[in-house]
């Protein structure tokens, strides 16, 4: 068996893998892609609802909205429904209202505000009133109004 000199340089495959990893890390964190495919569920201690298309439901006491890894909690909520009785929008208030979601990388986003207005169609949550959001690896933001895109994890 012949011995050959070994190079200290990483192989081309290793260099490409490192480059690819670096490019992936430069991309913005994306919210769970499969969350949007999950049904939106809301629970509470009590509720009052209309029996008409394009109606609404008022929830009271320990309100919890979930859709995949997305979770919104609060004391009170109003859910707006379309003609098929699917949830299109939920406004949650609490002391404070809380939102959290895990992105595809496993990073947790958490936020609190006096009110969270979640648009299930546009996948946007607007936190209003002493709003605070923390995203692992991306820092935190505070303000009177913060907008969080649950599809892209972008905060404005």
Regions from the PLM with identified roles:
Residues 26-28:
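N-terminal signal peptide c-region/cleavage motif recognized by signal peptidases
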Residues 2-17:
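Bacterial N-terminal signal peptides that target proteins for export
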């Amino acid at each position: 068996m012949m011995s050959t000199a070994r190079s200290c340089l990483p192989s081309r495959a290793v260099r490409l893998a490192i480059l690819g990893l670096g490019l992936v890390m430069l991309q913005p964190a994306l919210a769970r892609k499969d969350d949007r495919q999950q049904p939106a569920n809301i629970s509470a201690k009590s509720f009052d609802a209309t029996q008409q298309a394009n109606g609404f439901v008022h929830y009271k006491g320990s309100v919890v909205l979930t859709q995949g890894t997305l979770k919104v909690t609060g004391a009170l909520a109003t859910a707006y429904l379309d003609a098929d009785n699917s949830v299109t929008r939920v406004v949650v208030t609490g002391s404070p209202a809380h939102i959290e979601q895990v992105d595809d990388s496993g990073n947790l986003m958490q936020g609190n505000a006096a009110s969270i207005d979640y648009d299930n169609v546009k996948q946007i949550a607007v936190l209003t009133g002493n709003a605070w959001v923390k995203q692992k690896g991306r820092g935190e933001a505070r303000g009177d109004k913060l907008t969080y895109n649950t599809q892209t994890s972008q905060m404005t």
